[in-house]
Amino acid sequence: TWCGYCPMLGSAFESAKSQMNGSLELVSLHGSDSNYEFSGTNTLASRFRVQGFPTGVVDARATINNDDQSVTSKAAVDVATETADSYPVTTGIACSSTLSGNTINVDLDLYVKEADTYRVTVLLLEDNITGYQNNGGRSDNNYVHNDVARLAITSMNGERVEVSEDYQVVKKSFSGTVKSSWDPDNMKVLIYVEKPYGDRDKVDGVDSRVVNYGNYGDTYIDNCRAVKVGETADLELK
């Protein structure tokens, strides 16, 4: 909330999502000195070698620098498009969630076309949070924060899912505790699935087909899905 340049990056990513017809899901990770501190931020900041805020990351493959909105949104779209072209999706996600008291329950069906070792991460996000934000050096007490990470329902490193055969369906259930100060009507669950790069067309350990490669580990995001709490998302492959 203290970061004056963060709204500009956020707007650029919203634009990128719109350009991709909603196939790009967003999550806003706040640091320890924000009003919306999230416990998992440091884990991902370390993985992606974040030196300062704001920093954008797309598909766990490449970081995006903050710039003019049109430049930044184009960079995000380019990386996401490159992921889809270079690494065709091999998983599909169907999910549902319910809130019982302060317990969030998430049921997941993971459709897997290709045997591999995957990692599944489940986060609880909140939209429409009105509060303070430094907006380009101007104090804005009515700024609307969206896609704010509230709870890591799994480890931030993801739950390991071993799939030994092609064309399998893996069923998983997760749960976590929700704070009473969070608005259930504005909550949604974000699920993303990471897959190892493998040895596809690599030269000296780097995929020769791609431009945007940050060497942030052995996996990239193969697919993701966001659904409002209390709703069901049917299988979607994209």
Located regions from the model:
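Short active-site neighborhood of thiol/selenol oxidoreductases, capturing the structured segment around
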Residues: 1-4, 191
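Typically the conserved alpha-helix immediately C-terminal to a functionally engaged Cys/Sec
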Residues: 4-21
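Short, conserved sequence motifs used for protein processing/export or organelle targeting and
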Residues: 15, 22-237
